[in-house]
């Protein structure tokens, strides 16, 4: 049986292998109970970020309803290493549990890694860089990109595009990890020639560009290099956007600022009465 094809169909296919007896010699698909101190953190966990608020909510749910889905663990000396379910394990400790339901499977490193990645992908728990690093870990285990795609049930292009994120400059990776730019922004940076990627990243941050504007930076850079005139128009930087919001709140109408060093301020009104109200707010009194 191909482990990769089984994993590609999901965890259920792996955990209920056809013809496999249930729970022999303390391992298998039978749910058992282990003391929580005998359960160890995963050697490789694709998910790097566990939000404290989310863990606290899960801990409260566990206090009220218990752990509804057992952890998957594998023997490691006198302990058992988590393969799938680390978030439940962390939350159970917060909830004060002393025992946890588990399924014990004798798994090799690569198979354990594949299962951990598939579980997180099925739950949509991984950030873009966590997903890319997880694929890279499978490559490091000896799989090629096609093998990784089969193992996790994704298209090869999905795996390839995710791995490309790892080629970004370190400041971009750090910003993506911190959430200060989106994966779509990062992919827009990837469309730039390698020498221009840091420049594009700084433009996105300093000018507050949206994804569409970030994608257009390649044309802007090309136009400047070839002397083809002024750069494309983009939205005002973040400071202007904040000013738009402040003026909109003050006047009670939509305000739009275009341009940077030079430009215009537009105020919208829907009636003569609304115009009079805006003029009064601005301190202008029309002559009778």
UniProtKB/Swiss-Prot annotation:
GO cellular component terms given for this protein: chromosome
A GO BP annotation: positive regulation of sporulation resulting in formation of a cellular spore
Molecular function GO terms recorded: DNA binding
SMART domains in the cross-refs: ParB (SM00470)
Listed InterPro entries: Chromosome_partition/occlusion, HTH_ParB/Spo0J, ParB/RepB/Spo0J, ParB/Sulfiredoxin_dom, ParB/Sulfiredoxin_sf, ParB_dimer_C
Keyword DNA-binding in record: yes
Domain of life of the organism encoding this protein: Bacteria
Key words of the record: Chromosome partition, DNA-binding
Chain's role: Involved in chromosome partition. Localize to both poles of the predivisional cell following completion of DNA replication. Binds to the DNA origin of replication.
Protein family (similarity comment): Belongs to the ParB family.
Protein name from the UniProt record: Probable chromosome 1-partitioning protein ParB
Species this chain originates from: Deinococcus radiodurans (strain ATCC 13939 / DSM 20539 / JCM 16871 / CCUG 27074 / LMG 4051 / NBRC 15346 / NCIMB 9279 / VKM B-1422 / R1)
């Amino acid at each position: 049986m191909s482990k990769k094809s089984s994993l590609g169909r999901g965890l259920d296919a792996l955990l209920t292998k056809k013809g496999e007896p249930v729970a022999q010699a303390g391992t298998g698909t039978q749910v058992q109970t282990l003391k929580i101190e005998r359960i160890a953190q995963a050697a490789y966990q694709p998910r790097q970020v566990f939000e404290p608020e989310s863990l606290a909510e899960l801990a409260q749910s566990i206090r009220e309803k218990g752990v509804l889905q057992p952890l998957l663990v594998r023997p490691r000396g006198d302990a058992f290493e988590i393969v799938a379910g680390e978030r439940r394990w962390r939350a159970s400790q917060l909830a004060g549990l002393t025992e946890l339901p588990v399924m014990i499977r004798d798994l090799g490193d690569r198979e354990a890694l594949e299962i951990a990645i598939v579980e997180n992908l099925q739950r949509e728990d991984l950030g873009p860089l966590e997903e890319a690093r997880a694929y890279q870990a499978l490559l490091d285990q000896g799989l090629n990109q096609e093998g990784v795609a089969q193992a996790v049930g994704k298209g090869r292009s999905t795996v390839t595009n995710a791995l490309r994120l790892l080629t970004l400059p370190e400041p971009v990776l750090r910003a993506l990890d911190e959430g200060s730019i989106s994966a779509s922004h990062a992919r827009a940076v990837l469309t730039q020639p390698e020498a221009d990627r840091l420049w594009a990243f700084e433009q996105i941050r300093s000018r507050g560009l949206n994804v569409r504007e970030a994608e257009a930076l390649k044309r802007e850079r090309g136009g400047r290099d070839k002397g083809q005139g002024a750069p494309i128009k983009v939205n005002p930087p973040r400071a202007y956007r904040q000013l738009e919001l402040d003026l909109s709140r003050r006047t009670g109408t939509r305000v739009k600022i275009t341009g940077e060093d030079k430009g215009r301020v537009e105020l919208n009104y829907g009636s003569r009465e609304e115009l009079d109200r805006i003029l009064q707010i601005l301190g202008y009194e029309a002559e009778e």
